[in-house]
Amino acid sequence: MLKGSLYKDIVRFMLEKSGYYVSPYGYDSSLSELKFKFTEETRNSKTGRRIRFSPDLLVYDDQNVMLVEVKMRGKSPPMIRASEIKNVKEFWNDSVLVVVVPEGNVFYAQRISELEIQESDYYQLSDFEKFQDIFTRVQAEDISYYKGIALQNMKIK
């Protein structure tokens, strides 16, 4: 299993346990066969780029439907490149970015539409909210449980 995929699964399990319906979505799951078929020309077309930057998960409950991109950063402070946000913002401005990091709450999230385009190279963790502030069904004990799993897999205790 790829490292990034593990953290997508951790986020998925936590959301499902909290009562959200979660389905894999996008380039790394339902469209993964396209990775090997794109030419450079199709990969860099507007539609090709939209597909490549598609979010990882479709998350919904009886009140919300969200597209969610999950990123893991194993170093502290986490480096979230502005160019990554710019690409997601261009095509998926209504999505949510979840960042899994080896510090604090471990799980953070922000609506892409609320992240301002900036001149600096990186976004700071302070630009994000605690995961449970965006995904309000998630309970503190679930954050604690999945935080332990995430940190163990990051080899940080």
Regions found by a protein language model. Give the residues of each.
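Acidic-basic catalytic patches of nuclease active cores, encompassing PD-(D/E)XK
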Residues: 1-46
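Catalytic cores of nucleic-acid endonucleases
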Residues: 9, 18, 23, 50-52, ...
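Short, structured active-site "lid" loops
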Residues: 39-66
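Glycine-rich, aromatic-bearing surface loops/beta-hairpins
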Residues: 105-157
